[in-house]
Swiss-Prot record:
Cited function: Catalyzes the isomerization between 2-isopropylmalate and 3-isopropylmalate, via the formation of 2-isopropylmaleate.
The gene coding this protein: leuD
Superkingdom classification of source: Bacteria
Gene3D superfamilies: Aconitase, domain 4
A Pfam match: Aconitase_C
Catalytic activity: (2R,3S)-3-isopropylmalate = (2S)-2-isopropylmalate
Record InterPro entries: 3-IsopropMal_deHydase_ssu, Aconitase/3IPM_dehydase_swvl, AconitaseA/IPMdHydase_ssu_swvl, IPMI_Swivel, LeuD
SUPFAM superfamilies the UniProt entry points to: LeuD/IlvD-like (SSF52016)
Protein's recorded name: 3-isopropylmalate dehydratase small subunit
GO cellular-component term (any): 3-isopropylmalate dehydratase complex
Length: 198
């Protein structure tokens, strides 16, 4: 996964609360066996409405989603994060995230930045007053900048570290490859073991 330090992109105001993972990507789109190509399913039931924000310019080119409270609740669905990223989002800002969504986001490289609800509403207002407004998320400083407005955001230290280092679960495991290989080399031959597939 690519390391995340800062990202600047067009802000997209999603004035909806309690957006669950089934609304982010309906189950019918989960049949792929790959980890990419889910952008068509993102907010699929809402995108059929021509007035939905992602159907409007310049928001259709946005990469910073500003959502209402309780974003990403519901079932554990990594595909929700993948769909957002496949569409082009790198940051989601909300006052509250579903716990599992927040964890999946950090493991995939999507920044889930938690700001106050007043902060979310201020960002909505700024974006709607100036469509195309660019928003910058700075993970090192843990702040969101929109024009002259600077808002702090919360993220747990471990997730911030993983994002800054670009460590998904596999990369995190590979940091201990020497210890894993030493363990495997010392493992008795008479015990059951797995063998690599040729």
């Amino acid at each position: 996964m690519e390391a995340f330090h800062t990202h600047t992109g067009i802000g997209v105001p999603l004035r909806r609360s309690n957006v669950d993972t089934d609304q982010i990507i309906p189950a019918v789109y989960l049949k792929r066996v790959t980890r990419t190509g889910f952008e068509d399913g993102l907010f699929a039931s809402w995108r059929s409405d021509p007035s939905f924000v992602l159907n409007l310019s310049p928001f259709d080119r946005g990469s910073v989603l500003v959502a209402g409270p309780d974003f990403g609740t519901g079932s554990s669905r990594e595909h929700a994060v993948w769909a957002l990223m496949d569409y082009g989002f790198r940051v989601v800002i909300s006052s509250r995230f579903g716990d599992i969504f927040r964890g999946n986001a950090g493991k995939a490289g999507l920044l889930a930045a938690e700001v106050s609800q007043d902060g979310v509403e201020l960002l909505w207002k700024l974006i709607e007053q100036s469509p195309g407004l660019e928003i910058t998320a700075n993970l090192q400083d843990r702040n969101i900048t929109a024009g002259t407005t600077v808002l702090p955001f919360k993220i747990d230290d471990h997730t911030a570290w993983r994002l800054l280092e670009g460590l998904d679960d596999i990369a995190l495991t590979l940091r201990k490859l020497d210890r894993i290989e030493s363990y495997e080399a010392a493992y008795p031959d008479w015990k059951p073991r797995t063998s690599p597939v040729a």
